[in-house]
């Protein structure tokens, strides 16, 4: 434990300097980026509403409602949400004073399908008519005891006080008729429509369903980027244009660095959302230098597992992300190298769910990298037996809840497989590299400042004329971790 603590103490000093120095923000670029994405968000909203209206008829719909999204995508609605959640063990519960997600019941596909049909009903397209009871006002009058009519101030039962009656067309099923194949596709309100599920559904959808799901993924991303990054930066940048984000070492369970005000550690990739271009040098003629590790978590998993095939692939210079993309594409799911990264990482943590092509890839991964698969079994056994795992750095992880459940599955298996890889990669290796780079820059008397560390990359605000020196410090500091 002491080696890990020593590193974190040294890293803490580096972080205080990074917080104090901050990073310069180009507010004009931030404004332009906001306008660009607000326009795209408006266009996406119009397109999504058009697609939803075609699929639902006149049924009211909100893009931000989980229940509406569930109804639209899967064309079904639970009869009773409490009974639905109880039948599948969905939702959250308090565990030792902390609210956590429940573990859904495991069941076979046939049993799952039967329960879904029994506990939910098909949704049909509707046509809207003005209510003939309240004439569209939503309010009705009542006759007084003396026989006269009072003012229309009571809610209309016929239309639910909205003034409109929605008549279903039982010959036309509403929505996009997607079918949930596993219990992970369900949620307490009906069906899951989070980011991962939408992306997964997009792969097998066609026509308007595919168009809607694809646009919805982008809509959610843009909404998140605007709220978290653009507004987050704008609300926290100082009058001098410097953003002093707050770094935190003791928040994530794996030990990796996190930040707030704003959160810069969930920043999207530059090609996906160019928020990084608003970070500029504080010096005229200066530049931003960014260096990162290549395929770090895959390499860490290979080293921890002593997987000979994985180590050979690394030595041979094989691009594992490109190969992941190739395997998925050959299986019928066209995938770019960038989009393939999440699938490369997923089996490192024992992930197996997904589309048919993704499941084929995960099987291929397990058969090729048997060392990693065997290591997973080993650490699961250790976690169950000792409730604890320790990394080579001395960083310990406690799993007091680890036990073998029904069907031989280990409770919390994903976390047990995930924490050592992510923790050793971004909780130990990258902080050591950051300390090394910081010390090298200080020894050389450089004016340049280290301003951020995001996952497996280190970012430096480079003073004019120090470009080569900074690059050498980054290279030497990041590679010297192996020493």
Language model regions located:
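Conserved "right-hand" nucleotidyltransferase catalytic core of DNA-directed polymerases
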Residues: 1-270, 283-287, 363, 371, ...
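Short alpha-helical scaffolding segments that buttress acidic/His motifs in well-ordered protein cores
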Residues: 11-15, 213-220, 297, 301, ...
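Conserved catalytic core of nucleic-acid polymerases
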Residues: 13, 20, 128-157, 164-165, ...
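Glycine- and acidic
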Residues: 19, 23-31, 215-216, 278-288, ...
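Function-dense linear segments that define catalytic or interfacial modules
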Residues: 245-333
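Catalytic palm subdomain of template-directed nucleic-acid polymerases
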Residues: 17-41, 301, 352-356, 458-475
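A common structural junction motif
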Residues: 475-483
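Short, contiguous acidic/charged loop-to-helix segments that flank catalytic cores in large enzymes
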Residues: 146-147, 201, 229-238, 270, ...
């Amino acid at each position: 434990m002491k080696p890990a603590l020593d590193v974190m103490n040294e890293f803490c000093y580096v972080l205080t300097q990074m917080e104090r120095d901050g990073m310069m923000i180009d507010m004009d670029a931030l404004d332009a980026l906001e306008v660009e994405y607000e326009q795209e968000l408006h266009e996406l909203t119009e397109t999504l509403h058009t697609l939803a209206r075609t699929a639902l008829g006149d049924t009211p719909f909100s893009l931000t409602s989980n229940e509406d999204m569930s109804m639209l995508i899967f064309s079904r609605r639970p009869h009773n949400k409490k009974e639905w959640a109880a039948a599948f063990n969905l939702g959250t519960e308090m565990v030792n004073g902390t609210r956590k997600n429940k573990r859904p019941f495991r069941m076979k596909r046939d049993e799952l399908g039967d329960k879904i049909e029994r506990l939910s009903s098909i949704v049909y397209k509707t046509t809207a008519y003005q209510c003939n009871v309240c004439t569209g006002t939503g309010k009705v009058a009542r006759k007084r005891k003396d026989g006269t009519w009072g003012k229309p101030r009571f809610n209309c039962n016929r239309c639910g006080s909205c003034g409109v009656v929605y008549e279903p067309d039982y010959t036309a099923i509403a929505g996009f008729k997607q079918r949930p194949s596993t219990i992970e596709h369900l949620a307490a309100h009906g069906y899951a429509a989070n980011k991962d599920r939408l992306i997964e559904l997009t792969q097998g959808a066609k026509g308007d369903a595919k168009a809607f799901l694809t646009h919805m993924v982008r809509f959610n991303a843009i909404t998140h980027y605007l709220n978290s990054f653009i507004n987050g930066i704008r609300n926290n940048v100082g009058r001098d244009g410097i953003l002093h984000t707050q770094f935190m070492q003791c928040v994530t369970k794996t030990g990796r660095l996190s930040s707030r005000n704003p959160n810069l550690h969930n920043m999207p990739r530059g090609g996906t959302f160019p928020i990084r271009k608003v970070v500029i040098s504080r010096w005229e003629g200066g530049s931003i230098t960014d260096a990162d590790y290549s395929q770090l978590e895959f390499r860490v998993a290979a080293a921890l597992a002593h997987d000979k095939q994985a180590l050979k692939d690394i030595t041979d210079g094989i691009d594992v992300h490109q190969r992941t993309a190739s395997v998925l594409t050959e299986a019928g799911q066209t995938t770019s190298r960038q989009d393939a990264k999440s699938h490369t990482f997923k089996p490192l943590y024992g992930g197996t769910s997904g589309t048919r092509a993704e499941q084929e890839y995960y099987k291929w991964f397990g058969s090729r990298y048997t060392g990693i698969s065997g290591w997973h079994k080993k650490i699961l056994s250790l976690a169950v037996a000792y409730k604890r795992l320790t990394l080579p750095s001395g960083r310990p992880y406690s799993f007091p809840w680890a036990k073998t459940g029904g069907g031989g599955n280990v409770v919390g298996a994903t976390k047990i497989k995930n924490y050592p890889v992510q923790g050793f990669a971004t909780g130990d290796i990258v902080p050591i590299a950051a300390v090394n780079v910081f010390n090298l820059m200080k020894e050389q008397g450089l004016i340049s400042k280290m301003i951020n560390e995001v996952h497996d990359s280190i970012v430096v605000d480079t003073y004019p004329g120090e470009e080569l020196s900074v690059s050498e410090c980054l290279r030497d500091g990041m590679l010297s971790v192996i020493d």
